[in-house]
């Protein structure tokens, strides 16, 4: 027998042996084997760094997606020996396209509009938030290396990086979704990603009333407060709906006013025409060039604003915000992390002290009492629902003291058979001190909305 014939027969035997080995794999093992094989061939034949749908516009994205999907389908068709049916092959194609073009196992969650947050706790655990509840998914990364590759895909288009010398970073996806990344040595479980997804459809007041976040009477009162240029502080915990409520309040600002919004990460979407949106700037790779919120607040005062809307007060900018409210820039809006209206006042006092001011605490509280008119307290309840749990008026008293008078509050009564919160919005039977001002301005707001209870 000729040598060429023996080589040919041996190759055929090896192919048959390989086929037999593959057919013994479980469907999941076969999928993993196929993905690894195709991914390796893609690495050998193409420059995958050029393929990133998150750096493309929509038309380029669709063209690239179609091209790459076709390439992968052709490569898979050549692997006829693997025991996968049509649906399984299609699933493998989609997963490979997501890995090659996008953010791997995160892509399907980014496409799902019902998901509000994505949380990656190392390569083996991916959580999602739906309707205010957190769920562990069965998705995972194949390795820490794949997870770090996805992180690089997020950061490299915007000129950011994360490594041991700079192990945490904030970023934003092209669709506006906020991203936080933290890696070892700060994270002890491996790389961690938190993505707060950008919501394409903004909830309006009708949506919030329908969802039971507040009553129509509460909305009407807040609308009047905005028109009267009352300074409003939205207080609440993480994920309690502060930004959503701030968007709603901002929608009540008259069209003919010049509005300056200031945020760490742009989330506010005002519909008015005359809006200037400012965003703080983090330091560059060398740790230089940062422009914090406080500097933007100071600069906004030179921009002839009718209203200043600060996405969130976290530090020394609270002093400049209060001074703006007390010096003619009334009608301003902002949010703060706090668990109650009283706690919000304490937090504001602490933040002003963080600004390095030499003002005594009594003087700071006097500024707060004269600057803040209304506090709206939000909360995320145990069933995942978000509600306005209090609307309170801040009433200045003498010697730096103030009274926090509740006007509306949510009374929780228990849970139903589906473990949903049962409760009612109640009114405290007290008129706001500026009710006469409402009548003088000719605004329609009945005294009755402060008297009778409304069940939901």
Which sequence ranges carry the predicted segments?
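Switch/coupling sub-region of P-loop NTPases
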Residues: 219-235, 244, 248-371, 377-379
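Conserved glycine(s) of the Walker
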Residues: 241
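AAA+ ATPase "lid" subdomain C-terminal helix
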Residues: 180-182, 374-384, 397
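Active-site phosphate-binding and catalytic loops of NTP-dependent enzymes
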Residues: 51-53, 78-85, 101-112, 154-171, ...
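P-loop NTP-binding catalytic core
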Residues: 112, 120, 125-228
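N-terminal anchoring/assembly modules that precede and organize ATP-driven motor systems
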Residues: 1-135
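NTP-binding/hydrolysis catalytic cores, primarily Walker-type P-loop NTPases
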Residues: 384-456
């Amino acid at each position: 027998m000729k040598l060429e014939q023996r080589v040919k027969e041996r190759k055929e035997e090896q192919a048959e042996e390989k086929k037999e080995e593959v057919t013994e794999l479980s469907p999941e093992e076969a999928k993993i084997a196929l993905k690894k094989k195709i991914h390796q061939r893609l690495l050998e034949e193409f420059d995958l760094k050029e393929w990133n749908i998150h750096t493309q516009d929509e038309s380029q994205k669709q063209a690239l997606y179609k091209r790459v999907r076709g390439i992968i389908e052709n490569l898979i068709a050549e692997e006829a020996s693997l025991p996968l049916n049509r649906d399984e092959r299609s699933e493998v194609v989609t997963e490979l396209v997501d890995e090659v073009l996008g953010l791997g196992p995160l892509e399907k969650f980014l496409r799902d509009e019902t998901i509000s947050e994505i949380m990656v706790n190392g390569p083996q655990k991916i959580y999602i938030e739906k309707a205010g509840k957190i769920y562990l998914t069965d998705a995972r990364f194949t390795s820490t290396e794949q997870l770090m590759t996805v992180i690089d895909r997020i950061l490299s288009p915007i000129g950011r990086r994360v490594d041991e010398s700079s192990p945490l970073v904030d970023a934003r996806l092209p669709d506006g979704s906020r991203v936080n990344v933290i890696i070892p040595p700060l994270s002890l479980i491996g790389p961690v990603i938190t993505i707060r997804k950008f919501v394409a459809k903004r909830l309006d007041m009708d949506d919030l009333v329908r969802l039971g976040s507040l009553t129509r009477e509460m909305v009407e009162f807040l609308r009047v407060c905005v028109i009267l240029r009352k300074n409003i502080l939205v207080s609440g915990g993480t994920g309690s709906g502060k930004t959503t409520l701030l968007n709603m309040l901002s929608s009540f600002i008259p069209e003919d006013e010049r509005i300056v919004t200031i945020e760490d990460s742009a989330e506010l979407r005002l519909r008015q025409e005359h809006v200037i949106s400012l965003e703080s700037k983090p330091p560059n790779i060398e740790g230089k060039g940062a422009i914090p919120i406080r500097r933007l607040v100071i600069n906004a005062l030179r921009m002839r604003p009718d209203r200043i809307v600060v996405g969130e007060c976290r530090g020394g900018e609270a002093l400049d915000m209060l001074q703006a409210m007390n010096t003619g820039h009334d009608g301003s809006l902002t949010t703060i992390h706090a668990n109650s209206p009283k706690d919000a006042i304490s937090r504001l006092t602490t933040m002003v002290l963080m600004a390095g001011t030499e003002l005594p605490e009594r003087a700071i509280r006097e500024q707060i009492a004269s600057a803040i008119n209304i506090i709206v307290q939000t909360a995320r309840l145990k069933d995942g629902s978000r509600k306005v749990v209090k609307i309170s008026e801040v009433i200045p008293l003498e010697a730096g003291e103030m009274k926090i008078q509740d006007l509306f509050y949510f009374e929780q009564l228990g849970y139903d058979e589906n473990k949903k919160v049962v409760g009612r919005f109640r009114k405290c039977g007290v008129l706001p001190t500026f009710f006469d001002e409402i009548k003088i301005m000719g605004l329609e707001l009945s005294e009755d909305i402060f008297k009778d209870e409304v069940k939901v």
